[in-house]
From Swiss-Prot:
Name of the gene this protein is made from: lipA
Lineage: superkingdom: Bacteria
Record's protein name: Lipoyl synthase
Top class in the EC scheme: transferase
GO molecular function, one term: 4 iron, 4 sulfur cluster binding
Pfam families given in the database record: LIAS_N, Radical_SAM
Subcellular locations according to the entry: Cytoplasm
Example of a GO cellular component annotation carried by this entry: cytoplasm
EC number, as in UniProt: 2.8.1.8
Ranges of residues in domain Radical SAM core: 79-296
Catalyzed reaction equations: [[Fe-S] cluster scaffold protein carrying a second [4Fe-4S](2+) cluster] + N(6)-octanoyl-L-lysyl-[protein] + 2 oxidized [2Fe-2S]-[ferredoxin] + 2 S-adenosyl-L-methionine + 4 H(+) = [[Fe-S] cluster scaffold protein] + N(6)-[(R)-dihydrolipoyl]-L-lysyl-[protein] + 4 Fe(3+) + 2 hydrogen sulfide + 2 5'-deoxyadenosine + 2 L-methionine + 2 reduced [2Fe-2S]-[ferredoxin]
Lineage, highest ranks first: Bacteria, Pseudomonadati, Pseudomonadota, Gammaproteobacteria, Pasteurellales
Amino acid sequence: MSTPFKMERGVKYRDAAKTSIIPVKNIDPNQELLKKPEWMKIKLPASSAKIESIKNGMRRHGLHSVCEEASCPNLHECFNHGTATFMILGAICTRRCPFCDVAHGKPLPPDPEEPQKLAETIQDMKLKYVVITSVDRDDLPDRGAGHFSECVKAVRELNPNIKIEILVPDFRGRVTQALEKLKDNPPDVFNHNLENVPRLYKEIRPGADYEWSLKLLREFKEMFPNIPTKSGLMVGLGETNEEILQVMQDLRDNGVTMLTLGQYLQPSRHHLPVARYVPPTEFDIFRDKANEMGFEHAACGPFVRSSYHADLQASGGLVK
């Protein structure tokens, strides 16, 4: 009889060590992968001085960016523009979603000094718009909502003119309690990603629930009707276009006015494979449909991610 796998606290488990313990076994690391089309090939910028400056600034304050931890394909572009999405509550997630490159494991307790460190780093970077996200923290009674609130408070106190977008987890089973924690320090934009279609949730988002996520977006909007809510989806995981359109309609029915839609990319052979590459023309169709549904801002394109050019999208600019 094999010995049960035991995780050590504070250790990052990635790739096979992470996805091998997912109940739904649907990943074959030896299968042939789809070839990337030309439109999915990125030309990296020549200069990396700005990139290293941002990385060093985060290391200096002991902070993390989701750009690095999730291996975002837009890292070079965003860092070269002096923007980044900060990831609070550590870099170890209590979930093990097989599309995501963020490490799984038993996280360390939240750093009580992180809100102040975050505020000072943002001040040093002279940011006017910031996105703050986090790993899932199912180990915490409030799922990390109180820490989010403290971070928003600290950032505003030191940067009074800044616009803050928070990209939150689903606060598993604690939606009402989490929103109570957030109400004293609300953001300028509230973002929570549905990621994909409900039919594929068991494979793509183990531990999550489609209706929970809609409830979170709906209840925040009811609490703060004047603050825009936002959500993001990935395509290329086996869903149909009709299913994506239905999710978009569900978002509108629950008060969401900002949408991001991008191509899923496989972080490693131990993650879910890409089922198809969606051409740019189809993303244009999705954007047109989103506009017809009443989304005020819809960023749709192969490289769009939930916080990609978030400042531009929030101000009404075209992102694709």
